[in-house]
Amino acid sequence: LDFKPGLAMTVTGIVRFYLIETTPHLKLYMTPINIDPDQPALPISHPFTYAIYLSKTQGRYSTLGLCEDTSALNEEVIDEEAFLKQTYLIHEERERMFFDALDKTSRGAVVCVFDITDRLQHMFFRHLDQRHPANRGRDGKHKDVIRTLYIEMDALVGRTMEAAADDDTALFV
């Protein structure tokens, strides 16, 4: 999406679409607009060119500080399934970035924040209690989302330790 905020200036943003339904009416969800990492209008990485490098080598990716649209789920614009798809898509982007950096960094530190645990716990904690008022009329389909996530995050720690197979220091918080 191109925006023209002033003379001879264009700012580019990116969005993702999620098809909610086609009948009886077309319902299409659009994410909030992200800064295009291929042509960032503002610094979104350090060095500035790192965002462009990632976009060129891995494809465009989410750039908002809170990419997972918790408001859309809270306001029932999207359902839990759509939110999970969105959240895991963003997590997979970050994993690719992390392992790319880990692979290419011979000295120094590689730091990555995997905030999927925070997002999913905030949005799915209520599913642990079937009596929670927000669960009225719903099945227990999402009661294991948090547990499953932590199993997956444990596997991520294992893959990280394998990728850093030497005796380097690893810190997981």
Describe these PLM feature segments:
Residues 142-146:
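Extracellular loop and loop/strand-boundary signature of outer-membrane beta-barrel proteins
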Residues 148-173:
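Metal-dependent active-site segment of extracytoplasmic phospho-/sulfohydrolases and closely related
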Residues 1-137:
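His/Asp/Glu-rich, glycine-adjacent segments
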